[in-house]
A protein has these predicted regions:
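Cytosolic eukaryotic protein kinase-like domains
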Residues: 2-18, 22-26, 59-76, 87-145, ...
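Conserved N-lobe motifs of Hanks-type protein kinase catalytic domains
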Residues: 43, 81-84
Length: 301
């Protein structure tokens, strides 16, 4: 656990003009003493709880490893990231032998759920002005706005944060949506990696491949070098998901043998359509059937 000395040294090792140092009791009370009913996530870097802090819904992450130089370096960076299309670190607290990071909470959850989860898909309010209008899947204009928001968030990471960082895990489950369905890229600790070179195009050798199958750029898997182009590939897969409504990787049981599960890459699926003589017809068949109104020219672009 933390000693009082290590707690203080950890907190004072990073600074921010905006991050708030919350008293521990506020974090504890906000999460109902870290109740299991408030738990909304679990990852290699810690546990995430939903909390109500000073009248605002927040996501509270209880961190595991907080003593490494890499942790403090990335924490310093996150404290000073402020962009409307990135999940923002609001503040931190120390107590109960843990460090807690407080993030803004995205009320509408992950984009992946809205595209692929049957219990969530179709819960987009078609006409929010008319409360009786009912719900409908994401319209074309909303999907375009989400894609644009993600692009702006990633651009901010690449152009406005020094030294260079990349995300490493751009995917629909790391794209969160606020109450207005504005895209918020989740770049919480553990997702970004410092590029050791001075050029973001050169990249840095990864000690291990980090990311998600279906979103990994082939050259990253082959050579093990992380660059912004690795993220751009993942962003391209996100665009294909927005267009097709299909996940990046599908699991299909073989009709001959139900025990055999074949993984189909969305990228391969779309590329096979493009490789067809009648590719426009094939591509049209790849489009999400829930998209009833869209401009073909802009979609195929």
């Amino acid at each position: 656990g933390f000693s009082a000395e290590s707690q203080n040294s950890t907190v004072t090792s990073f600074s921010s003009d905006k991050a708030i140092n919350f008293p521990y009791h506020e974090i504890r009370d906000a999460t109902s003493n870290f109740s299991l009913s408030q738990k909304i996530g679990q990852g290699s870097y810690g546990t995430v709880y939903l909390g109500k802090l000073r009248g605002t819904d927040v996501a509270v992450k209880q961190m595991k490893d907080t003593k490494s130089r890499e942790f403090l370096s990335e924490l310093n960076m996150l404290c000073n990231v402020h962009h409307t299309n990135l999940i923002e670190l609001i503040g931190h607290a120390v107590g109960g032998d843990s460090l807690f990071l407080v993030y803004e909470f995205a009320q509408n959850g992950a984009l992946s759920d809205h595209l692929h989860k049957s219990s969530v898909r179709g819960k987009f309010h078609a006409l929010k002005i008319d409360k009786n209008a009912g719900f409908a899947p994401f319209p074309w204009t909303t999907r375009i706005q989400i894609a644009l928001g993600v692009a702006k968030g990633l651009e901010y990471i690449y152009l406005h944060i020094k030294p260079y960082y990349v995300h490493r895990d751009v995917k629909t489950s790391n794209i969160l949506l606020d109450s207005n369905f504005r895209a918020k890229v989740d770049c919480r600790f553990g997702l970004v990696k410092l590029l050791e070179q001075h050029s973001k195009e050169i990249g840095t050798a990864a000690s291990r491949i980090v990311g998600t199958i279906g979103y990994l750029a082939p050259e990253y898997v082959r050579d093990g070098y992380v660059t912004t182009k690795s993220d751009v590939y993942g962003f391209g897969v996100v665009l294909l998901e927005l267009l097709s409504g299909q996940p990046a990787l599908s699991r299909d049981a073989s009709p001959e043998n139900s025990q055999y599960v074949e993984h189909r890459s969305l990228v391969d699926y779309i590329l096979s359509a493009l490789d067809n003589d009648d590719y426009l017809t094939k591509l049209t068949q790849c489009i999400d059937s829930a998209l009833s109104h869209y401009h073909e020219d802009s979609l195929f672009q």
